[in-house]
């Protein structure tokens, strides 16, 4: 550590430890990790990502493998992302896209929700709209073009060759296109059709609706008299409703489904088996997934069987989360544990992963987020409430408490360093023949450098004391 001028402690070039004020240490990959100002500053390079942040105000990360440059400003309030010569950003309700930052005439968008929309579409056509007064908006909500004037008085949309006109939304609408037709005077009457696949209509919605279906392998029709009853019969299935949606019976081949009433009692038999007394208790089984709950959504169990993996999850929301992933052999038998994860919210989280080189584990306290590994939180917020952290991987261990008031770093059996800032620190570097200790960041210190003993007094006095 570069706290005293002589090499009485096993510092390497660029390393320093001033507790929560500033620290710099090499990780197992030989990359320098910097932290400072308590929880407010951090910078590191890991897994191909270069990162630095002033938490929670600003952070920036660059990943060379996928050419991604990501900036967060008071996340989730604002963000800027550049990738493959494209830029997207948001700040509050303002959003923007530039699809080629190297071309000033490229496709772009600017939205100031919910009032202003402008840009240039993929065909090079400019557009602008002010809601609700009027204008043209392209490439929005799955539509190629949208035009409105004094919404909801009038608007029209285009998607491929399908054109829709609407007056006094949602009352009058008329849609026409290749193999598509829709018309409504809501709620009095409406009809729609798609190719030769189906035809639907309603009268005095939602009280009466009906449809005819001519899908290949599934033909028939049905009706709904809401809220009294309904019936649908196709060539491969049949469904009855009584007081919809409360009571329902459906049969589709070997599969049956019953609501008695929905959502409280739900029962299914066949390839998918299910029984719910919601929200008190329930279970569901498919070929590869089994779930169970009690007092939903508090107690949840989920098991997933895949050809090469088993995933087990247990939740006592929002307090306890546990997950285990196990590997299988060619016969489908579980033979090893690949990873585990547990969280006792808001106190701690612990994860462990087994890789080709050994086991990597990570412990963090506190853990205020009820969600797991949310990128924006990890980049901008979690360091603020991380009072203690322990990371271990093959050949490397790092422990930090109170943002560096206590820190311990181990690299194999050759290097170790422990600091209780600003009281005492000690360490050893076998490769460089260094070891030593110091009190008060140099008030008193003793160490060896390549076998030569040295004494440190009053921060400035450097006294050789023999070999």
Feature names for model-found ranges:
Residues 1-5:
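Bacterial N-terminal signal peptides
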Residues 11-467:
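Outer-membrane beta-barrel proteins and related beta-barrel translocases across Gram-negative bacteria
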């Amino acid at each position: 550590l570069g706290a005293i001028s002589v090499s009485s402690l096993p510092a390497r070039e660029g390393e320093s430890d001033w507790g929560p004020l500033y620290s710099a240490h090499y990780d197992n990959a030989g990359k320098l990790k910097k932290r400072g100002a308590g929880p407010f500053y951090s910078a590191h390079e890991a897994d191909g990502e270069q990162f630095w942040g002033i938490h929670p105000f600003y952070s920036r990360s660059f990943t060379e493998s996928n050419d991604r440059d990501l900036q967060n400003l008071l996340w989730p309030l604002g963000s800027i992302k550049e990738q493959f010569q494209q830029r997207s950003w948001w700040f509050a309700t303002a959003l923007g896209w530039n699809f080629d930052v190297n071309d000033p005439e490229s496709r772009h968008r600017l939205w100031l929700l919910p009032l202003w929309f402008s840009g240039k579409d993929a065909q090079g056509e400019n557009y602008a709209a002010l809601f609700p007064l009027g204008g043209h908006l392209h490439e929005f909500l799955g539509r190629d073009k949208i035009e409105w004037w004094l919404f909801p008085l009038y608007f029209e949309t285009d998607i491929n060759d399908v054109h829709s006109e609407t007056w006094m939304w949602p009352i009058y609408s008329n849609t026409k296109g290749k193999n598509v037709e829709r018309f409504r005077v809501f709620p009095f009457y409406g009809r729609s059709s798609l190719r030769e696949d189906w035809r639907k209509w309603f009268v005095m919605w939602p009280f009466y609706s009906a449809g005819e279906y001519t899908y290949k392998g599934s033909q028939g029709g049905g009706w709904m008299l809401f809220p009294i009853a309904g019936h649908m019969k196709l060539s491969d299935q049949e469904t009855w409703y009584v007081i919809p949606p409360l009571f329902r019976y459906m049969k589709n081949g070997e599969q049956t489904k019953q609501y008695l009433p929905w959502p409280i009692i739900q029962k299914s038999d066949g390839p998918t088996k299910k029984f719910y007394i919601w929200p008190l208790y329930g279970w569901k089984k498919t070929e590869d997934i089994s779930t169970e709950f009690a007092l939903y959504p508090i107690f949840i169990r989920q098991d997933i069987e895949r050809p090469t993996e088993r995933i087990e999850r247990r939740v006592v929301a929002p307090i306890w989360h546990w997950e285990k992933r196990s590997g299988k052999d060619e016969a489908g038998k579980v033979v090893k544990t690949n990873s585990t994860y547990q969280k006792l919210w808001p106190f701690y989280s612990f994860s462990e992963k087994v890789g080709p080189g050994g086991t990597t584990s990570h412990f963090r306290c506190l853990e205020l987020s009820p969600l797991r590994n949310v990128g924006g939180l990890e980049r901008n917020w979690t360091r603020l409430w991380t009072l203690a952290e322990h990371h271990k991987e093959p050949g490397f261990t790092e422990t930090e408490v109170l943002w560096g008031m206590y820190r311990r770093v181990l690299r194999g059996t050759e290097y170790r360093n422990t600091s209780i800032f600003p009281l005492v620190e000690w360490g050893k570097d076998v490769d460089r023949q260094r070891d030593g200790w110091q009190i008060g960041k140099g008030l008193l210190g003793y160490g060896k450098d390549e076998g030569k003993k040295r004494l440190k007094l009053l921060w400035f006095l450097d006294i050789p004391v023999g070999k």
